[in-house]
């Protein structure tokens, strides 16, 4: 009996390990396995984050929200092979930037399967989903259909993060993107706002945080900065700094904007790239950028929660706010 229990335990732990290595949750239809796993939830470092889906607790606790959602979707697809995903869920599978605030209920294409409406799922009829594709073994709406579905319902700053990442992934121009939206989405609910988002999209934006700050600049009437401008280190021309935002104002003043938490530098030596302590590199880079004679303005993500204070910070940095630009954005976004 003890030997049988040990074999069962080793088999299940091996299956959990395999699921972890594959970036998914363990899904099982086997009642014996299910009973064993549920007996050991809370012990043996096993968790059941979704019904019938299991993983190691220490691994789950270490994941970001995005990683948790991705593993959940893959586990659900394993458990329900006839399920397909759209909207923000599909966007994650396609590798798009989906802000955490948009990650909640599942976005399911109703393919004749039994979907628990009580779970708050967002359902889409198959005939409305278009041609489905497979990404990492999961059925999802096509890339551009996914982007369009997201922009039709996303708030401005979140939608801009998704749109920027779509342009970055596919290398298409903003004009081509807007034309695609016009052809595919004209007449649909949310089309006008989707077009507003697309009209500001920029594939040079490297992540969702950068996109959301740019959305703030746009909505509050500040000039839109250049993105990912490169500077040579004045003390060491072999080192290149790439900054998040760069404003060149009418009076000739230049302001560099940096979103905290991301170090962008390339240090070359005889063998190629050399690693540098990130904290030291961040401080060194900032001090060297100031030697170029430019102001350096640092942003933290929490500042988006207090737009009034952020407006004042921009004013003190000398970046002019134009009420007419803010009004133009409000008119386009709200339709008045």
Set out the residue ranges of the language-model regions.
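Short gly/ser-rich loop at a beta-strand->alpha-helix junction or flexible surface loop bordering the NTP-binding
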Residues: 1-190, 321-322, 327-336
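Surface segments flanking catalytic/ligand-binding clefts of nucleic-acid enzymes
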Residues: 3-19, 24-32, 167-336
